[in-house]
A protein has these predicted regions:
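Start-of-helix register in tetratricopeptide repeats
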Residues: 41, 75-78, 112, 149-152, ...
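"A position-specific structural signal for the A-helix of alpha-solenoid helical repeats
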Residues: 38-41, 45, 82, 116, ...
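Flexible helix-coil transition and linker loops at the boundaries of alpha-helical arrays
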Residues: 26-36, 67-76, 139-151
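Short coil turns that delineate tetratricopeptide repeat
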Residues: 71-74, 108, 142, 185-186, ...
């Protein structure tokens, strides 16, 4: 029995489509990787397809095959980052942090490792570390040309920096970060961050403005934000004690 003919055109289209999907997700850290070795790029696309489908074991196996071909810093940055992504998806936090930290060493312009590290620190209430990583990610993004820059990520980074600085009681810097955030597209829940900031600054009027905007844009967050800002304004929230 003869094998069916290979439709190379369809196969090439599938590869290009997969590459574009991953490029949109991972941007600058992916685009320059293995630029001179298309066979390795095909392996990388295959690895990312498996990782995105949560087949982390197969994805990691393919990454191991790719490792000997890491020649340039761009290759090493991408490879190291995606190993970190495997550990993240596998729930191995310590290994994830180690690999993302290693990826961050291969070029300041790659913002993704810093965003991953920032969010990890932020969710663990390590606000100073989170703020520092967000600042570095912002620097990376601002170094890019306006055409290449992801303004949604930039708006998110500034908003999360605002949150970290608010929790550190660095209100002047937090408000500056919020002013910068508003220059870019913001997530629907961003007004919750602003409401908490202004409550911490004891500005009830601005707090109310952002809660109203939250009601219009992201009503699912209204109740918890109203309660938190009420406690902050009343001086009963443990993270924002009233100075006597």
């Amino acid at each position: 029995m003869e094998n069916p003919p290979i439709d190379f055109e369809t196969a090439e289209f599938a590869l290009r489509r997969s590459w574009e999907i991953h490029r949109q997700a991972f941007g600058p850290i992916l685009e320059p990787a293995f630029e001179e070795n298309q066979q390795v790029r095909i392996l990388l696309i295959n690895a990312l397809n498996h990782i995105s489908n949560r087949d982390v074991k197969r994805g990691m196996k393919l990454l191991k095959e790719i490792h000997p071909h890491c020649i340039y810093d761009e290759d090493k940055a991408a490879w190291t980052f995606f190993v970190g992504l495997c550990f993240e998806m596998g729930g191995a936090r310590e290994q994830m942090l180690q690999w993302y930290e290693n990826a961050a060493k291969f070029g300041h312009r790659f913002y993704l490792p810093f965003m991953k590290l920032a969010k990890a620190a932020h969710t663990q209430a390590q606000f100073q570390k989170g703020a520092d990583y967000y600042k570095t990610a912002i620097d990376c993004l601002l170094e890019m040309s306006e055409n290449d820059r992801d303004e949604v990520i930039l708006g998110s980074a500034y908003t999360n920096l605002t949150s970290c600085l608010t929790m550190l009681h660095q209100y002047t810097d937090a408000e500056k970060a919020w002013m910068e955030a508003q220059k870019y597209p913001l997530q629907p829940g961003a007004d919750a961050t602003a409401a908490i900031l202004y409550a911490a600054m004891q500005n009830a009027e601005k707090t109310a403005v952002h809660i109203q905007q939250l009601k219009e844009k992201f009503p699912g967050w209204v109740a918890q934000t109203v309660e938190m800002t009420r406690q902050i304004l009343d001086g009963t929230h443990p993270a924002f004690p009233v100075e006597k």
